UniProtKB/Swiss-Prot annotation:
Belongs to the RAD52 family. The lineage of its organism: Bacteria, Thermotogati, Deinococcota, Deinococci, Deinococcales. InterPro entries: Rad52_fam. The gene is ddrA. The keyword Phosphoprotein does not apply. GO terms for biological process: cellular response to desiccation; cellular response to gamma radiation; DNA repair. GO terms for molecular function: DNA binding. It comes from Deinococcus radiodurans (strain ATCC 13939 / DSM 20539 / JCM 16871 / CCUG 27074 / LMG 4051 / NBRC 15346 / NCIMB 9279 / VKM B-1422 / R1). Keywords: DNA damage, DNA repair, DNA-binding, Stress response. Homooligomer composed of 8 to 10 subunits; probably arranged in a ring-structure. Induction: Induced to high levels following extreme ionizing radiation exposure. Also highly induced in response to desiccation stress. This is Single-stranded DNA-binding protein DdrA. ssDNA-binding protein that contributes to the ionizing radiation resistance of D.radiodurans. Plays a role in DNA repair and genome reconstitution, in a RecA-independent process, since DdrA is essential for recovery from severe genomic fragmentation as a result of exposure to severe levels of ionizing radiation in an environment lacking nutrients. In vitro, binds to the 3'-ends of single-stranded DNA, protecting them from nuclease degradation. Thus, DdrA is part of a DNA end-protection system that helps to preserve genome integrity following irradiation or desiccation.
Amino acid sequence: MKLSDVQKRLQAPFPAHTVSWKPAAFNAERTRALLLAHVDARAVQDRLDAVCPDDWSFEMEVVSGAEVPTVKGRLTVLGVTREDIGEAPEGSMAAYKAAASDAMKRCAVQFGIGRYLYDLPKQWADWDDARRGPKHLPELPEWARPDHERTPGGAHLVQAMEQLRYELPEDLDLQREVYKHLKAALGSIHPVPTGPVPTNPVQGGRAA
């Protein structure tokens, strides 16, 4: 088995209940937050166990001299290795565990695992500062859900989008026409988000 044989399974969207949302910025009153989607390292491990349980490994080493707890991760899947750096806020040894999880997720993105989360639109949502979480979780679009969670219409739409990636017309004018209609359709589904100007962005907010 080669990496190319399992690429689509690795890249498949995660179940909606495994996707969490973290704030990237707040309004001045901290009643609204700009949310980014992410999954935790355990979801990444579960995906690797499901696709290639005996053919992946993760190694890490602490990066000395860094300003914040930093870990260099090395993820190997079916003989292919990817490396990346994970960071966490200052703290005790628990911060290094968080940095290791961050490194693993960033390495996994290089294999396509969870990469689609970067394509999700950023959303402003009501924020419960006492509970340190959004009052209501955003809805994931159809294309960001696994097959069994999609409506029949949504599944057909995703299939058509996938086909469009490989069957674009060669004529440049036709490509522009396709792009115009696609942009209009996506704009009606996900209008440009509006929200207060962020006053205190959270460092390191990223989806992965």
